Regions:
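Polar/charged alpha-helical tracts
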Residues: 9-13, 17, 64-65, 119-123
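Conserved SAM/SAH cofactor-binding pocket of Class I
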Residues: 112-143
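Residue-identity detector for glycine
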Residues: 18, 29, 70, 80, ...
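Non-catalytic nucleic-acid substrate-recognition regions in nucleic-acid-modifying enzymes
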Residues: 1-35
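Residues at secondary-structure transition points
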Residues: 6, 104-108, 133-136
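Short, polar/charged, Gly/Pro-enriched helix-capping and turn/loop motifs at alpha-helix termini
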Residues: 25, 29, 84, 124-127
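Conserved AdoMet
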Residues: 2, 36-37, 41-120
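Glycine-rich, flexible loop segments associated with nucleotide phosphate handling
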Residues: 29-39, 128-131
Length: 143
């Protein structure tokens, strides 16, 4: 590990450059992926903060431990590992779900599927329908 020191703003620029040069981190079929936003999400997650906090304190210097974690996560993310797996958690319909390499990470289109199902059930006046969620991954849809 180098003894390089970074402020939050400097590390975000460093990570953004990495994301701009690599393509493995991109999700196929999703066209609005921003290297800057990806860097912000990654650093916020690594520091267990939110993006607003990063923007409020751009001059704050990363500690050695924070830098080590951020760099390790950046290397894994650049190789295509989803941020949710780095964090061990993914939010689905405002529910924080634990995820591992053994589970499928719920996607935005899965949330849309739930929305459509709820709309259809309302149209059909189904107040307590029987629904089977079998073999769909993390079980997020059933929740």
């Amino acid at each position: 590990m180098s003894s390089k020191r970074y402020t939050l703003a400097q590390w975000l620029e460093h990570a953004e450059a990495g994301f701009s040069q690599q393509t493995q981190w991109r999700v196929p079929g999703v066209h609005d992926q921003s290297p800057r936003l990806e860097a912000q999400w990654l650093l916020a997650a690594a520091l267990e903060k939110n993006i607003a906090w990063l923007m409020t304190w751009p001059e704050r210097e990363l500690t050695a431990a924070q830098l080590q974690r951020a760099e390790a996560w950046l290397a894994r993310r650049l190789c295509g590992e989803p941020l949710a797996l780095l964090r061990g958690e993914h939010e689905f319909w405002s529910l924080p779900l634990s995820v591992t390499a053994d589970t499928l990470v719920p996607r935005a289109d899965s949330e849309r599927l739930v929305e459509v199902a709820l709309e259809r059930m309302a149209q059909m006046n189904l107040s307590a329908p029987a629904i089977l969620d079998l073999g769909t991954g993390s079980g997020a849809i059933a929740l």
